[in-house]
Amino acid sequence: MTSPELPSASTPDAAGVPFAVPGAEWHVEDDFGLSLTLAIGRARQTFRWLRPGSFLMGSPADEPQRGSAELLHEVTLSRGFWIADTACTQALWMAVWPVNPSHFQDDPRNPVENVAWHDAQRFIGELNRRLSGVHARLPTEAEWEYACRAGTTTPFSFGSTVTTDEINYHGDFPYAGGAPGAYRQRPLPVRTLPANAWGLYEMHGNVWEWCEDWYADYPHEPQIDPRGPAFGKMRVLRGGTWSDPARYARAATRSRIEPAYRPRSTGFRLVLGAP
């Protein structure tokens, strides 16, 4: 397959044109859009291109089981970005960092977990050092929700309710009167469950995912490329986990913990941005 001709990372991206990533093995256009794959040792990570766009971040007042910190407000992301189609796996982690911190180590396709925000930043720093010209980072909270929603406005990218065939959550606690489902008591290997409409797997459930931002209340005004406050005490977590009720896997759910804390249900997902 012939790779599309892409501009360099320094090319202005106002029109949402995907930028090239040095060292990418190939670019593929499929039903989900454009993707690229990076090789790090024996590990491979696919990234999906998300175009710039505007969306409503947070949840409407009538959304069942919403949290108090989910003020609905308009957000515009003015630049496109590449986002990993899965959480960082243990295989990818071990290709960069020699010690696997995870509790569930029986499958290298499992998401890495038991990771502090600071651990993720050290991993990313080493990854960027090894892959010259690559600018990996954590997603901002706004980028994360934009990617999770994949153009939807419902509580989940799959619709107004979900089952454990779609999301790995504590199935004894379904969403808004839904039927109980499986409680797997552990994370699943990535790509086990269906992708959202933009080709991203397990954005809901499985493991919490760190975001770049310090946690703060949402503003009432429309925002362009929000990045959170400059200082804070807690970093943002998104997505819910295998051990939580379904409500915590909603696209709008926000959580936060201290960046040095290492819960065994927390991992992260990479974004590639222009330097």
Which residues does each predicted region cover?
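Disulfide-stabilized, aromatic/cysteine-rich ligand-recognition loop
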Residues: 2-15, 19, 194-196, 229-275
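GGW-centered surface loops in extracellular recognition modules
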Residues: 3, 14-49
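A short glycine-rich, aromatic-capped structural motif
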Residues: 37-101, 116-118, 205, 274
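Short, polar loop/linker segments at the starts of domains and inter-domain junctions
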Residues: 36-38, 59-78, 177-179, 185, ...
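Aromatic-acidic/polar surface patches that form glycan- and anion
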Residues: 82-86, 113-116, 193, 259-263
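Functional-site microenvironments in short loops/helix caps that host divalent-cation chemistry
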Residues: 50, 56, 60-61, 103-106, ...
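Generic alpha-helical secondary structure signal
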Residues: 88-96, 122, 244, 248, ...
